[in-house]
Structure formats: C-alpha cells, structure tokens
Amino acid sequence: MSSTGSSVSTSGLVLPSTPLAEPGKEVPLVVNTPNRAKPPRHWIDLSIEERVQAVKDFGVPAFRARQISAHVFERWEVDPTQWTDLPKAARQEIADAWFPVLLTKVSQQSCDRGTTVKTLWRLHGGALVESVLMYYPATRHSAARATLCLSSQAGCGMACPFCATGQGGIQRNMSTAEIVSQVLAANRLIAAGEVPGASGRVHNIVFMGMGEPMANYRSVLTAIRTLTADGPDGVGMSARALTLSTVGLVPRIKALTQEGIPVTLAVSLHAPDDELRDELIPVNRRWKVDELLDAAWHYAEKTKRRVSIEYALMKDINDQADRAAVLARQIRRRGDWTWAHVNLIPLNPTPGSRWTASRPEDQDAFVETLERWKIPVTVRDTRGSEIDGACGQLAAVGRSEGLGS
C-alpha cells in the first residue's frame, strides 16, 4: 500500500485510492485542436509542383525550384537573400513570399557537458515550444548518433496528469514547416560545432516533444514525408530513423498503418489495465488498452517494424511487479512477443509535482518480471532532466508571449 492509500481493482491490481488528477485542477481532454494563429505558408509547406509554380510566378525558370530546395533541405539555409546562385532581382521577392520567419530562438540551455541542448522557440502568434538535441558518443555496441526530440504542437490537449506539457493545455497545432524547421536548426547547430563531439547532421528524430503528434496528423505526416524524401526535395532521412509517439489515438494509428511509411511507432502506454490507464491517460476512456494494443500489433505486422511500448515508472502508482506481469501477458497473447519492445522511463520530476520516480528495487522487480516472460525491455538513459528537457518535462515555461497563460 502506498503512503496515500490504495485499493484493489476488479482485476486484482493495486489502484490509488485518491484521484490522480488533483480535484479542481483537471485539464480537459482536447483531441481536435483548434487551428488558431496559423503561420503563413513557407517553402517547406509547398508540394514539389507548388514550388515549381512559385518560381515561375516570379519569372524564374522551373529548375530554380530544385536549386532553392537544395539550399533548404541539403544545406539547411533559410535566407534566400544570401543565395548568390539565384538571380539577384528575385531573391528578396522569394524571401518575402515564401520564407517567413517561423522559429525565433528565445533561449538555449545545455547540460551533459554540452551534449544535450534544449532550445525554446517562439512561433508565429507568440506560442512557445521546445526541442531537445541529444548527442550520444559511440560505444562498443552502437555508433555515435545525434537524436532530436521535436515538438508537433504548442502545448498538448491529452491532459495526462503526470506530464508537464499535458497540464499546460493546448494552444495550437504546428505547421509542417515549423516541425521540419526544428530539424534544420538542429543540423545547423551541429554544423557550427556547438554540440561537442557531434558531426554531420541529426541521425534520429523522435516525435516526443510537446504535443500529441497523432492529433496533428496531417502536418506531422507531411513533415515525415518531407524529412524522408530524397534531396533536394527533402531532407533525405531514412523512415526507420524516425519514431512517432502517441498516447493512443487508435483511428490515427490505423491510418498510419496504411501509409506505407515504416517509421517506428511508440505507444505511451504507462499502464496495462483500463482501470489505472483511464486515470493516467484520459484518452483511454475513448480507446481502451485492448483497442490500442491491437492497433499497435497490426502496425507491427504490416510494417515489419517493432513497436516501442513507453512506460514511465511512477512510485506506488504503476510500478508493481503484478502490473509488469499483466503487461507481459498483453504483449504475449498477441502472438510472437518480439513485435514489441518495452522502454521503461524513470519518471522525471516537474516543479511542484507530487509524482515521483519508482524506488530502485521496484524498478528492478518490474524489469525482472518482464525478463522472466521473455519480453524485450530496456530502461531509458534519461537525458536533460537538469534543464527540464527530459520526457514529460517540456512545458515551455511562460507558455506564450501575447497569448496569455
């Protein structure tokens, strides 16, 4: 029993006896995000055909469209006035028409000896978002890599009580160009030598920053297509280097399954039973655990990509060995258990939060239970907690400039 008291669910699992969302402070669940304060369209937002037409409208030959795209996606440049290979007369016109400023850097913090960098951005309209760049040096088992955790919404409408972003509510969706621009900015940061040891460009992208990516499906999907398109029309990344996270918008998972883009799907599960998950993840009241895991299994079957099951361990809430056994059974009963990999996340603290990380012995027991069931499991190497840049901590302190709290 926890210090706050507990009860037992109909399935025999321990449940907190007090509400997990503090009374009077519940944040409403918002699945359909209002598109307020939308940014102007950017070159990145245009289709290949629209880019060709855009340069023609300025009296410039069609081949210039690919030239412009090469600057953007291969050299990560976004100021046409500096591009001497474009006709001088057209540079400012193109800049004014298709290159509005989308991200303005407000602040930048680093930790882990400079290998973790969190950037606070101001968007069009004043909303604030954050992205985190993490460099991992080579080890005996893996090559060096730079991973970018990017945002897809300003705020989040999923209202998860343990997540700083979710407790701030939702302001608006981000555009495709705003999403991709975070990657270009990270590449410029690496190229400038501002991340010790890193070279080249971002190797992996995780849609695990601010927002629920599946609630901004159209912009996120177009961003993924742009990031994975061959140069000069896109950034030229492998879809397998991208991870798309969701708390469980089942219809969008089913839609993604049919897209034919083999990104890694990460399911933020955090509880294997509906009784607890209804409290931790409010969207579970709409799409239950079985529906979610069925959709995830079908995604793995269709794409041949292993699904990542994200599970933040919270002291006396969801960290019991009995729950690990339930999670293992949920995975095993859907066939070959190697379709999923459990990624355990030590809960990261947020200012004023009553949520805390599991005791080491409880975390170890959880891992051992999964291993006894032969479930692939790892404990995440948490980065950036000193600068509030770790999982669940991104809140863009101050929320916005000119939009209120």
Curated annotation (Swiss-Prot):
Quote the catalytic activity from the record.
adenosine(2503) in 23S rRNA + 2 reduced [2Fe-2S]-[ferredoxin] + 2 S-adenosyl-L-methionine = 2-methyladenosine(2503) in 23S rRNA + 5'-deoxyadenosine + L-methionine + 2 oxidized [2Fe-2S]-[ferredoxin] + S-adenosyl-L-homocysteine; adenosine(37) in tRNA + 2 reduced [2Fe-2S]-[ferredoxin] + 2 S-adenosyl-L-methionine = 2-methyladenosine(37) in tRNA + 5'-deoxyadenosine + L-methionine + 2 oxidized [2Fe-2S]-[ferredoxin] + S-adenosyl-L-homocysteine
Q: Which domain of life is it from?
A: Bacteria
Q: Ion transport among the record's keywords?
A: no
> Which cofactors does this protein require?
[4Fe-4S] cluster
Q: Name one GO molecular function term.
A: rRNA (adenine(2503)-C2-)-methyltransferase activity
Domain Radical SAM core, first and last residues per copy: 142-386
Q: Where is this region: Disordered?
A: 1-34
Query: What are the catalytic residues?
Result: E130 (proton acceptor), C391 (s-methylcysteine intermediate)
Q: What else is known?
A: Reaction proceeds by a ping-pong mechanism involving intermediate methylation of a conserved cysteine residue.
By sequence similarity, the record places it as follows: Belongs to the radical SAM superfamily. RlmN family.
What protein name applies here?
A: Probable dual-specificity RNA methyltransferase RlmN
Organism per entry = Cutibacterium acnes (strain DSM 16379 / KPA171202)
The organism that produces this protein has a lineage beginning with: Bacteria, Bacillati, Actinomycetota, Actinomycetes, Propionibacteriales
